[in-house]
Amino acid sequence: LNFEIVIAIELYNFVTSKFGRNTLRYFIELAYKGTNYCGWQYQPDANSVQETLNKALSILLKKEIDVVGAGRTDTGVHAKQMYAHFDYDAAIDSQQLVHKLNSFLPKDIVVLNIIKVSDEAHARFDAKKRTYEYHIHTFKDVFENEGSWLHQLPLDVDK
């Protein structure tokens, strides 16, 4: 009987570790300047925001972490507010982890908040809206050359 209990416990531990049971889900609110990244999503042989965040979380939490983003951005695109989620097998001190992540991450990525959510919550599928801002200017401006697009022809806003 003891042998069967040990086998049952080992099987339970194996299943829960492989299939994500017994984990807690957390949303991360972050912002980033995308100039140095190939975008949000992981790409082989390129530096992505997702990969950078995965590495930082995995090192600090001492477990491989894969974040799931609410959306994707392209190469060089910035995000003022982005959400992602990850699963972890223990309770997290959110304020402490935010502080550690911001000390560890490069200066162009900032974690604003970490929030415990229900296990069913999904950053991508539960997002209610997405807002995109496009910045253009119609004259050369040395202060706006990095975060906007220069368009020197007259704009046709009715088109």
Question: Language-model features: where?
Answer:
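Intrinsic disorder
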Residues: 3, 14-17
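A general, composition-driven signal for non-globular sequence regions
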Residues: 12-15, 66
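Compositionally biased, low-complexity intrinsically disordered regions
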Residues: 1-4, 10
